[in-house]
Structures are given as C-alpha cells and as structure tokens.
A protein has these predicted regions:
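Surface-exposed cleft-lining segments at the edges of enzyme active sites
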Residues: 29-39, 135-138
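Active-site-adjacent betaalpha module
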Residues: 1-19, 49-52, 56-57, 83-213
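A short, flexible beta-alpha/helix-coil linker loop
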Residues: 27-29, 168-169
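Short acidic/His/Gly/Ser-rich catalytic and metal-binding motifs that mark active-site loops
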Residues: 28-31, 71-73
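Active-site metal-binding loops of divalent metal-dependent hydrolases
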Residues: 24-25, 67, 140, 166
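Acidic-leg catalytic submotif of subtilisin-like serine proteases
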Residues: 19-28
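A short alpha/beta connector and helix-capping loop motif
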Residues: 16, 20, 33-66
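Short, electropositive alpha-helical surface patch
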Residues: 72-88
Length: 213
C-alpha cells in the first residue's frame, strides 16, 4: 500500500449501498501491452481478491471498460495525444478484453469513450438508480482513468474509497510507474477519496458477514 497517506478520511461500506468498481482492467493496460503498466497483473489480482470477499457478503460489482466501435469513438481530446487509441482498444481485440475471472454474470458493465467514466458515460446515473452512495475503486491506470473517474465520482457527491494496491500506473515522463502511481494516490487521498489497501478492505468485509455455526 502507499505510505504516509495524507488524508484521514474513512468511509463505511454497506452491501446495499456500496459498489466495488473496476476501471479498465483490460489486457491493453497490462504489462507488455499497448499501455505499459508493469504492476497491472498484481493490481488486478488484488481486485479479484477484494471482489471475492465482497460478493460473499452480497455486494454488487461493476466494471468500467474502454472499448471502441465505429458507433462509440474516442471523445474529448484523447486522439490529439493518442491518435491510434481507437484501434488499440477496438472491440474484438485482445487489448479490449477484460482480465479473466473478473466480470461475472449480473455485474454492471459500463463502456466509456474518454478517461473519466463520469464525463463519458451514464455511470453516475446508473449507480444512483441502484441507491449507491459509496464506490470502492481499483483499476488501471492510477493517474489517468482511475484518477479522473474518482475525481468525477467525488464531485458528483458519491463517497469514494480507492484500493491503492488494486491500482497500477505506467511510467509518465520522468516519473517511474511506481512514482506516478504514488503521486496519483496521494493526490486522490488529499481531497477526493479515502485510501486503503485490499487487505484492510477484505478484513472490513469479512466483519460484515454473519458468523457461521
């Protein structure tokens, strides 16, 4: 987990009002792929761990995915910086596929066309329709799609918890992947989200489950 988190904010989780949300956990954001994210596999495995515990107590799981089609093209100014992104994450390609054992029947899946799922989809409306007031987030990549979506969720009035070790980053400019991840986590903790690691979340969730006899 990231060290010395600057925020002391914490939020409770309740299965009926909290959703566990993965952001862009797709092969195109993995190590050695279109977007070089060296710790992607570890982050996704931590999300799987969180989701297994969350599902056991009846919690809902949702997924944001960036998948482009001729009818669903990149929005905003993305193509100014990544001209080939529509092809890199085109429907039907391996890069656009979700990591295995992540999306299960009954999960909510929302497709986006820009970095922020709040700006480029009806994610917030769909969460509110389910009476969700708290969103627990993991995904790829920490400073881009995770951070912009977390910002939007928080500004929309939803409580956000980021699972730091269920997120990962690519290297950005002079920042290593680890440095870029850490900077994004610290920024989100500063004003936008509570931050914890997967182990803490799982312990909290297990405490919600009734004791077995």
């Amino acid at each position: 987990m990231s060290k010395q988190i600057v925020s002391n904010v914490s939020y409770p989780v309740t299965p009926g009002m909290t959703v566990l949300l993965s952001i862009d956990c797709q092969f195109g954001f993995g190590a050695g792929s279109w977007e070089q994210v060296p710790h992607a596999d570890a982050a996704v495995e931590n999300f799987r761990t969180a989701s297994r515990a969350w599902r056991k107590c009846g919690g809902a799981v949702a997924h944001v995915q960036t998948v482009y089609t001729p009818e669903r093209e990149p929005s905003g100014r993305i193509t100014d910086f990544e001209p080939g992104i529509a092809g890199s994450l085109a429907a039907g390609t391996r890069a656009a596929e979700a990591y295995p054992d992540l999306v299960l029947d009954g999960d909510l899946v929302v497709y986006t066309t820009a970095f922020s799922a709040v700006q480029s989809s009806d994610l917030v409306d769909r969460l509110r329709a389910r009476d969700i007031d708290t969103v627990v987030v993991g995904g790829l990549t920490t400073p881009i799609c995770v951070q912009t979506t977390v910002d939007g969720l928080s500004m929309a009035g939803l409580k956000v918890i980021v699972l730091a070790d269920a997120c990962a980053s690519q290297a950005i400019g002079t920042l290593s992947a680890e440095q870029a991840h850490e900077a994004a986590i610290q920024r989100m903790a500063y004003l936008f989200a509570a931050v914890e690691d997967t182990g803490d979340f799982v312990a909290t969730v297990r405490a919600l489950q009734p004791a077995t006899r």
